């Protein structure tokens, strides 16, 4: 189960990188990725991940759906789904509902995150009861994390840390150690999958080591990365591929469908 937990975390963190824009406003869109076990061109398909980012007049609405059905060994089969619905009020607050189902066992978590007294106050409702926590004021909410990542890459930063809130991962904060690399990963889709063109003028290959920075279980931060990510991010805020290495499991995600969404026409602020 440790491998599956790592895989779920890897994909949740990876999804944070699948939207945003450094040179303009974040462009809303719906992106669908095919997940394959390993990086070989003939790697077995094990699922999909879909992220839908919608801009509203009040902020951002995020819908994320992950589905994995895989046989990791002849005797170990896994069925895992994760659904997230979240609303972010332009960095001021975040409200979400997440439902995960592992081999038929369902777990639902709801929560809100708000700035108070110089910190992020997290209120979570789990099947085990309320689970409040406090996160550093430097923690970025999902869309805010996207914006910060892209601004730093576009600005020429070679390496930098990023604290990001991942609502699916027990409502905790994660430290992303970002490095610009010489080449991206998962640039070549399998022969059976058509290549989807990403609207952009620039792109940045990167690698990210992920550790848990704000645990909610009282344990110290992780000493080693629990997930590493490799990919290429375009200035339109979209990735065409990503490799997530969770130790015992490596998953490659390839973009298979992309739809750009229109921004709403909102009344001017008073």
PLM feature spans:
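Residues that cap or initiate secondary-structure elements
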Residues: 39-41, 57, 70-72, 92, ...
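Bacterial N-terminal signal peptides
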Residues: 8-19
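A short, structured loop/turn motif at beta-sheet edges
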Residues: 24-26, 52-61, 87-92, 198-200, ...
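N-terminal cleavable signal peptides for secretion/export
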Residues: 22-77
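Hydrophobic/aromatic-rich structural module bridging two neighboring secondary-structure elements via a short loop
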Residues: 64-116
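Mature, soluble, non-transmembrane domains
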Residues: 97-270
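Hydrophobic/aromatic beta-strand elements that line small-molecule binding cavities or substrate pockets
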Residues: 48-54, 81-87, 111, 229-231
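Positively charged n-region of N-terminal signal peptides that target proteins for export
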Residues: 1-6
């Amino acid at each position: 189960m440790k491998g599956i937990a790592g895989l779920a975390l890897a994909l949740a963190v990876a999804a944070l990188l699948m939207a945003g824009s450094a040179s303009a406003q974040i462009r809303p869109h719906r992106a669908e990725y095919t997940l394959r076990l390993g990086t070989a061109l003939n790697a077995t398909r094990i699922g999909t991940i879909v992220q839908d980012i919608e801009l509203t007049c009040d902020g951002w609405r995020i819908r994320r759906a992950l589905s994995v059905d895989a046989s990791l060994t002849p005797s170990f089969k896994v069925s895992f789904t994760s659904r997230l619905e979240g609303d972010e009020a332009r960095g001021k607050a975040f409200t979400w509902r997440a439902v995960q189902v592992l081999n038929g066992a369902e777990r639902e978590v709801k929560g809100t995150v708000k700035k108070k007294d110089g910190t992020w106050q997290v209120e979570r409702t789990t099947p085990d009861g309320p689970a409040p926590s406090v996160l550093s004021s430097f923690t970025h909410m999902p869309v805010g994390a996207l914006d910060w990542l892209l601004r730093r890459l576009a600005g020429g930063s070679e390496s930098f840390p990023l604290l990001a809130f991942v609502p699916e991962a027990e409502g905790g904060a994660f430290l992303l150690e970002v490095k610009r690399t010489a080449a991206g990963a998962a640039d070549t889709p399998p022969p059976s999958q058509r290549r989807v063109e990403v609207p952009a003028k620039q792109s940045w290959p990167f690698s990210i080591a992920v550790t848990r920075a704000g645990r909610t279980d009282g344990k110290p931060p992780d000493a080693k990365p629990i997930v590493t990510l490799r990919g290429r991010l375009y200035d339109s805020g979209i990735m065409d591929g990503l490799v997530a290495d969770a130790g015992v499991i490596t998953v490659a995600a390839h973009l298979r469908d992309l739809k750009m969404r229109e921004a709403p026409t909102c009344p001017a602020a008073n």
